[in-house]
From Swiss-Prot:
Homotetramer. Pathway: Glycan biosynthesis; glycogen biosynthesis. It comes from Cyanothece sp. (strain PCC 7425 / ATCC 29141). It comes from the Bacteria. Involved in the biosynthesis of ADP-glucose, a building block required for the elongation reactions to produce glycogen. Catalyzes the reaction between ATP and alpha-D-glucose 1-phosphate (G1P) to produce pyrophosphate and ADP-Glc. It catalyses: alpha-D-glucose 1-phosphate + ATP + H(+) = ADP-alpha-D-glucose + diphosphate. Belongs to the bacterial/plant glucose-1-phosphate adenylyltransferase family. PANTHER family: GLUCOSE-1-PHOSPHATE ADENYLYLTRANSFERASE LARGE SUBUNIT 1, CHLOROPLASTIC-RELATED (PTHR43523:SF12), GLUCOSE-1-PHOSPHATE ADENYLYLTRANSFERASE-RELATED (PTHR43523). Alpha-D-glucose 1-phosphate binds at G162, E177, K178, S209. This is Glucose-1-phosphate adenylyltransferase. Pfam families: LbH_GLGC, NTP_transferase. The gene is glgC. One of its GO terms (molecular function) is structural constituent of carboxysome shell.
Length: 429
């Protein structure tokens, strides 16, 4: 894979994931107790022996830069790297990134310097495990100009994706972005041609683009230069290229989740606790997911009842109930608490005992979850200070609310407590 250069698209402002993206880029959003979203595509690259990786981003990239710099340091005997390329204004390009294709176009001067055969374009907000070597080999074996990774999907969700029609060789013959009604029906394909059983094909009669592409080097350069007004791969570049280029497909029939919204992010995290078999597992020695080593002590559980949950490193839990939840590193939960169907991201630091004691004596709220608090169907961002006898339960069943001044939002019926928020004692949300 020495002839492959990976380009991970960090995405835009992350408005669908707000407020989790208020102070961080979308790829830097914490995941599964100890990881960040960017760790997924980068780990897939490393496990696929692709070690030349750029990450393109333009919003709130400080924490992403810090995470990548601390995590992905290849040895001095390797030429591998993972490097962030932030949007910048130049005399030739006075605007910020206008879309996925425009982001790559603005850095063509750098990307084209690499003597590679293929560019691998990836997204920074998907949860999946893929061996990109199989993807690139499919591209090479079919003499393709462009290859798209596609996913068989059922009709209920098909209109949320860019859909493809293909011939029996797997070549793309038509492309439609998020079709509805009759246009959706016309995009049905026989997925048994891709190895699905008749029963699976009947359930999943559509092929959806995953937003993951392999381009021949010169093909990508030519397409971006010939169409300077085209800013998006899925909506413009790929449909245009399908008319006169060999655009092939690679079927990925495994777990894949676009976690670009609060609802999908919440569900994907809690699905990791599902028994007996979660849809995605971080416990795979052959293809591990890497992240920054923190050298934290083991978690300490004092008289706790924990059911179907994931507890990160360095947590301190006292006489509490944890049910179907994910707790991030350094989470602290006091006695009498109930954490139910919740995602707690933990903390960036430990608060010394003397400081905690001083805050409690002065009726202030220390870091963590205070005694006798209930957190149900919620996301609590890092470094939140939740007081005693607080109830975060969305008691009025609100779907959407902006209470930023009070330290929380409600998105899709899920309460999201902001990073560094302080929720006073006896608050009911």
């Amino acid at each position: 894979m020495k002839k492959v250069l990976a380009i991970i698209l960090g995405g835009g402002a992350g408005t669908r994931l707000y407020p989790l993206t208020k102070q961080r880029a979308k790829p830097a959003v914490p995941l599964a107790g100890k990881y960040r979203l960017i760790d997924i595509p980068v780990s897939n690259c490393i496990n696929s022996e692709i070690t030349h990786v750029y990450v393109l981003t333009q919003f709130n990239s400080a924490s992403l830069n810090r995470h990548i710099a601390r995590t992905y340091n290849f040895s001095g005997f390797s030429d591998g790297f993972v490097e962030v390329l932030a949007a910048q204004q130049t005399p030739e390009n006075p605007d910020w990134f206008q879309g996925t294709a425009d982001a790559v176009r603005q850095y063509l001067w750098l990307l084209s310097d690499w003597e590679v055969d293929y560019y691998l374009i990836l997204s920074g907000d998907h949860l999946y495990r893929m061996d990109y070597r199989l993807f690139v080999n499919r591209h090479r074996d079919t003499n393709a100009d462009i290859t798209l990774s596609v996913l068989p999907v059922e009709e209920q969700v098909a209109s949320s994706f860019g859909l493809l029609q293909v011939d029996h060789s797997g070549r793309v013959t038509a492309f439609s972005e998020k079709p509805q009604g009759e246009a959706l029906t016309r995009m049905r394909v026989d997925t048994t041609d891709f190895g699905l059983t008749p029963a699976e094909a009947a359930h999943k009669p559509y092929l959806a683009s995953m937003g993951i592409y392999v381009f021949n080097r010169q093909v990508l350069i030519d397409l971006l230069k010939q169409s300077p007004q085209s800013t998006d791969f899925g909506k413009e570049i790929i449909p245009m290229a399908a008319t006169d280029h060999n655009v092939q497909t690679y079927l990925f029939n495994d777990y894949w989740e676009d976690i670009g919204t609060i609802s999908s992010f919440y569900e994907a995290n809690l699905a990791l606790t599902r028994q007996p078999q979660p849809p995605f597992s971080f416990y795979d020695e052959k293809a591990p997911i890497y992240t920054r080593p923190r050298y934290l002590p083991p978690s300490k559980l004092l008289d706790c009842q924990v059911t179907e949950s994931i507890i990160g490193e360095g947590c301190i839990l006292k006489n509490c109930q944890i049910q179907h939840s994910v707790l991030g590193v350094r989470s602290r939960i006091e006695s009498g608490c109930v954490i139910d169907n919740a995602l707690l991201m933990g903390a960036d630091f430990y608060q010394p005992f003397a400081e905690r004691d001083h805050k409690i004596k002065n009726n202030s709220v220390p870091l963590g979850i205070g005694a006798d608090t209930i957190v149900r169907r919620a996301i609590v961002d890092k470094n939140a200070c939740i007081g005693r006898n607080v109830k975060i339960v969305n008691k009025d069943h609100v779907e959407e609310a902006n209470r930023e001044s009070e330290g929380f939002y409600i998105r899709n019926g899920i309460v999201v407590v902001l990073k560094n928020a302080v929720i006073p004692d006896n608050t009911v949300i």
